[in-house]
């Protein structure tokens, strides 16, 4: 059988952002990403009532895990830049944070379906690249999300 991921939409209060209909946004973003030629997992099913999405599971480490564990993401940068170029050509930004990218068989997959209208400030070159190696930003994120101790993959 095929392994899948079940994503349950949750609603958290957020002062600075209005999400609108999140399940419809998920479907719309999936179509926009496919149209832009971004490598994403297949959406297998969507249940608008239960606000659930079933998508293909992409096995492999995230780019974040690789960097955290001492590996380099260098070999994946050309693919990330190609995705960024495709997204920009379609008028989109994707979330370039390295937890959203899984490496499998030499390819990276964008495993989140989130995308937004393109803004240069949030492009890969201006924002995302800052987290694709052991930069001060990456180290600050690690420290902030691990209580100062080494983060574990579990």
Residue ranges and their predicted role:
Residues 13, 62, 118-120:
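Conserved protein kinase catalytic core
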Residues 1-24:
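ATP-binding glycine-rich loop module of kinase domains
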Residues 1-2, 56-57, 104:
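Active-site beta-strand termini and strand-to-loop segments that position acidic
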